[in-house]
Amino acid sequence: MEDSTTKNIKEIYLAGGCFWGIEAYAKKIYGVIETTAGYANGKTENTTYRELHSTDHAETVHIKYDADKLSLKKLLKFYFQVIDPTSINKQGNDRGRQYRTGIYYTNPKDREIILQEISEQQKKYTDKIQVEVEPLKNY
């Protein structure tokens, strides 16, 4: 991971199965400054691992990145390399709603970039991409 001396720090939240795998992968990407594993976009503001089934949060990684070194588009291309975007509520051996795929944004301008990348990725699959795209509600 890079140091955080840059002024152009952006953030995105990525859900893609167990958060430990996504986090470990993201840490190796040039331009990523910081990663944090947590739970996002559930029915309640906060949750715990034991409450996941009732609160409907997704295991998610908060990624801060230097936009001068790494674009959101490029970061999303890396993300799509390590998930199965056509599966619903599962990745690999991990099964359940908490393992769903999702891209959660805090900057409304990111939505268009995300949807463009999904459209681009869809060309690689016959099945429909099932990745949630939503504003971040909670983390």
What are these regions (language model features)?
Residues 1-139:
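Flexible coil/turn and secondary-structure edge motifs
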